[in-house]
Design a protein with these regions (language model features):
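N-terminal carbohydrate-binding/catalytic regions of secreted carbohydrate-active enzymes
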Residues: 117, 122-219, 362, 366-380, ...
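Active-site groove signature of glycoside hydrolases
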Residues: 212-246, 270-274, 383
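Aromatic-rich peripheral "rim/lid" segments of glycoside hydrolase catalytic domains that contact
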Residues: 6, 47, 52-67, 71, ...
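Glycoside hydrolase catalytic-domain groove-lining segments
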Residues: 168-189, 304, 308-354
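Aromatic-lined carbohydrate-recognition surfaces of secreted/lumenal glycan-active proteins
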Residues: 127-129, 260-284, 342-356, 382-388
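Aromatic- and acid-rich polysaccharide-binding/catalytic face
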Residues: 151-160, 186-190, 286-324, 386-388
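Boundary/entry segment of secreted carbohydrate-active catalytic domains
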Residues: 20-168, 422, 426
């Protein structure tokens, strides 16, 4: 991976004002949309076991998915006459939808969030709405819920730096909406100090964390998901003294979580969010990014599907267990995670299907296939769609790219497996 040096600015500042270009392979993006000074290597680049990347051993008893195994023959929900994959796109209608909110779906009373917000059964369903647009927050969430005709269990929001405290008043309102309560997933990326500096007690960062802890204790006592610097793989620089080694990240993550908890923030449920980009996950430093079981409650990963043949083109199994010919020892992220973190629930923290004018029917087909495939992935306990009309390269992940894709996504969201009663109160 090449590093584009930015003259006349310090390394810490340069990394503080950029976001990860995860869209290139996983699609993960920061809502601010500032380009990161890194570029990804091609899919055929070096990095196989022969060049030092680790060999991963998996235990099938932990829930490992054999990609060659046939799928169960019975679909999770009847097709109900959904049209076949179209050959031409039906564009999404623009403009605000002013229809009333859809009623919350009928929940399975036996499926509800439990300890550390892990569902007793089923999978939490959520969204990061309106990314890379002016319409974010409650407005974007309401629009997404109207068009998909269901309530979202998780609302994913992004924060950076030391100026804004969270959850914000708007986010608290989203979580506490009467009869439509939601779980917050708050994503914080520190700026102004390197990982190493934060881990060693950077004064400015510590002062912010102390203010943040006071704010949370005073204003929000419900449980919420929390992550620190998601997709950090894209920022790792394995050079002594860089301040951004994998070990630096693990120590920084520990420092942030432990400082917040030491100051009374006992309601955060931590998610370590990986970038599921195969060349990164097979690096020798990848496992060293783990901060420790005591500060990580969930394992998350960001991954996106592509509608055109090539890298990332396929179904849900490909999305969750993406492999690469040049990295033959990598079993796929899901398989790796259930082996490496067998006792941790998994969250797909960002996912979506990039649209294509050449292959507009792929998105609807992906959602229909997903309905049959998702029950196989027993360790997935939450999925959060990243909904944007355009990422930094103009790629569209909206579920309503075509009429058929919206219909398929609506049916997907109403499957029994995605019906979980949200209870975010501290036990």
């Amino acid at each position: 991976m090449r590093l584009l040096h930015l003259a006349a600015v310090t390394t810490a500042f340069a990394l503080s004002v950029v976001t990860t270009l995860a869209w290139a392979w996983t699609g993960g993006v920061d809502e601010l949309g500032i380009p990161l000074p890194y570029s990804h290597p091609g899919a055929s680049g070096p990095g196989s076991a022969a060049d030092g990347s680790p060999t991963v051993h998996v235990d099938p008893s932990n829930g490992w998915i054999d990609p060659t195994a046939p799928e169960p023959g019975v679909p999770a929900v009847p097709d109900q006459g959904l049209p076949g994959r179209p050959t031409t796109a039906a564009p999404s209608t623009a403009g605000p939808d002013r229809r009333p909110h859809p009623a919350p779906p009928v929940r399975n009373p036996s499926c509800r969030t439990g300890e550390k917000l892990v569902p007793t059964c089923g999978i939490l369903w959520g969204v990061a709405p309106g990314a890379f647009t002016e319409q974010r927050g409650a407005v974007a969430l309401a629009a997404f819920e109207r068009k998909t005709e269901r309530h979202q269990d998780i609302y994913h929001a992004y924060h950076r730096g030391e100026k804004q405290l969270f959850p914000t008043k708007e986010e608290i309102g989203i979580a506490r909406e009467r009869g439509r309560e939601r779980l917050l997933f708050l994503n914080w990326k520190p700026v102004g100090a390197s990982w190493e500096e934060i881990a060693e007690g950077d004064k400015k960062t510590d002062a912010y964390l102390d203010r943040l802890a006071k704010h949370i204790r005073k204003n929000y006592r419900e449980q919420f998901f929390f992550t620190v610097h998601h997709e950090a793989e894209d920022n790792v620089r394995e050079k002594s003294g860089s301040g951004y080694t994998a070990d630096d990240y693990a120590k920084m993550y520990r420092h942030v979580v432990k400082r917040l908890r030491a100051r009374g923030v006992d309601n955060l449920v931590t998610v370590l969010v990986h970038m599921a980009y195969v060349p990164h996950t097979t690096k020798s430093w990848f496992d060293r990014m783990y901060p420790g079981d005591d500060v990580v409650d969930w394992i998350g990963f960001d991954t996106y599907a592509y509608s055109d043949p090539g890298y990332g083109h396929g179904d849900l199994t490909e999305l969750l267990n993406r492999r690469m010919g040049s990295r033959p020892t990598w079993p796929g992220f899901y398989n790796w995670a259930v082996n490496r973190h067998a006792d941790k629930p998994l969250m797909v923290a960002e996912w979506g299907v990039w649209s294509s004018k050449k292959n507009p029917g792929h998105k609807a087909g992906f959602y229909r296939d997903m309905a049959r495939q998702i029950p196989r992935f027993k360790n997935i306990r939450a999925m959060v769609h990243f909904d944007t009309p355009h990422n930094q390269k103009g790629m569209d992940s909206r579920v309503d790219a075509t009429r058929e894709s919206l219909a398929a996504y609506r049916r997907l969201g109403h499957l029994p497996i995605f019906q979980v009663e949200v209870d975010n109160a501290l036990s």
